[in-house]
């Protein structure tokens, strides 16, 4: 295929783990016809149709199998890479930029957080899922760190799939984990649609790129979305917490200032003995620079944080931080999804930081409901 795949189609490509892509054959040439191309396994399972490609002319094609968007610089500047699968795709930054015209501003922000974060959301087809489960025991022999290192036989760094914990009963908590099955229960040990990987984009790159394209068509919308990305998140639940706590009150957020995401905190000697490490990372750290007080928000989801061993590590980390005088709030998906519980958390944070608490007006509460629906959405639906 000679055309450059972009926008939502490219977004789905970049969400697909390399070990999944390696299971598929190359795409047929578009000279064989777009109908044949659209029936290839990788398109059916991952890219979906219509395939969105860039066009440097005024011609706009819209069909069941293909759609083009006008983009003058697509074939004059280096904006794409060769996938090795028989087609080229826009790089992650230009993928986000070309998505601007076809997704909501909130979905664009979520996509930016995902590309800048340590996670991706992808649900394999049933056949691919079986193939992945067969290699699950082999993957479990490696640590998270080793999965981020290339060996001599690998072209790309494999991603680490997050598996569900045992005894998960409540389907509501699955909302932040993309509702992996339709029954409302995630099977014990079953692979979820959450994957861990290195960030595709550095957050500084995103902000520089946004400033560069601000004057172009759709550039202002892209720039405004990029301004809302304020840190490097490790899960969709963290993104939801960040946006609900940092967004302006008129937009439904709590409008806390001085928020830091996955902030590094050196531990005291006694805290090191508890945690067994020299430093800890707080999911969301909110600071009052005047009083020099800080609270730490720890986002907790069973599937997000994986195994019981990881949960035990979270507990020791929280205890270590509390021993140093930090107020640590353990927040779940259900708490974020309930106005009264979230409001109580915001009230408590204000008290700890000696900030003035202001109840939300009815209009602000309506805006919060809309924001909550957007950020606690099914992440698999972004870009569809």
Task: Walk through the language-model features, giving the residues of each.
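Surface segments flanking catalytic/ligand-binding clefts of nucleic-acid enzymes
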Residues: 155-174, 178-180, 185-384
């Amino acid at each position: 295929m000679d055309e450059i795949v972009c926008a939502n189609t490219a977004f789905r490509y970049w969400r697909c783990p390399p070990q999944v892509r390696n299971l598929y054959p190359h795409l047929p040439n578009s000279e064989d016809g777009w109908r044949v191309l659209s029936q290839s396994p990788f398109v059916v399972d991952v890219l979906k149709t219509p395939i969105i490609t860039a066009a440097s002319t005024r011609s706009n094609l819209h069909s069941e199998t293909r759609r083009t968007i006008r983009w003058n610089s697509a074939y004059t500047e280096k904006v794409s890479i060769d996938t090795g699968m028989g087609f080229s795709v826009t790089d992650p930054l230009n993928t986000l930029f070309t998505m601007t015209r076809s997704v909501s501003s909130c979905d664009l922000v979520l996509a930016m957080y995902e590309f800048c974060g340590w996670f991706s959301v992808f649900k394999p087809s049933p056949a691919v899922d079986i193939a992945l489960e067969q290699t699950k025991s082999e993957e479990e022999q490696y640590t998270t760190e080793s999965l981020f290192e290339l060996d001599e036989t690998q072209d790309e760094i494999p991603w680490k799939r997050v598996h569900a914990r045992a005894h998960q009963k409540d389907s509501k908590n699955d909302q932040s984990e993309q509702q992996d099955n339709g029954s409302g229960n995630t099977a014990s040990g079953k692979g979820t649609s959450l994957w861990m990987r290195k960030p595709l984009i550095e957050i500084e790159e995103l902000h520089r790129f946004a400033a560069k394209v601000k004057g172009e068509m759709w550039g202002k919308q892209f720039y405004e979305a990029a301004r809302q990305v304020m840190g490097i998140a490790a899960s969709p639940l963290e993104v939801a917490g960040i946006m609900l706590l940092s967004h302006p009150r008129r937009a439904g957020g709590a409008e806390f200032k001085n928020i830091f995401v996955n902030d590094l905190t050196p531990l005291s000697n006694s805290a090191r003995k508890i945690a067994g490490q020299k430093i800890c990372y707080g999911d969301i750290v909110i600071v009052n620079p005047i009083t020099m007080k800080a609270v730490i928000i720890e986002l907790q989801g069973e599937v997000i944080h994986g195994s019981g061993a990881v949960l035990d590590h979270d507990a020791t980390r929280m205890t270590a931080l509390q021993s140093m005088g930090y107020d640590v709030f353990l927040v779940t998906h259900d708490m974020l999804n309930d106005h009264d519980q979230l409001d109580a958390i915001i009230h408590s944070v204000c008290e700890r930081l000696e900030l003035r608490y202001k109840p939300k007006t009815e209009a602000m509460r309506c805006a919060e409901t809309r924001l909550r629906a957007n950020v606690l959405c099914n992440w698999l639906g972004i870009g569809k």
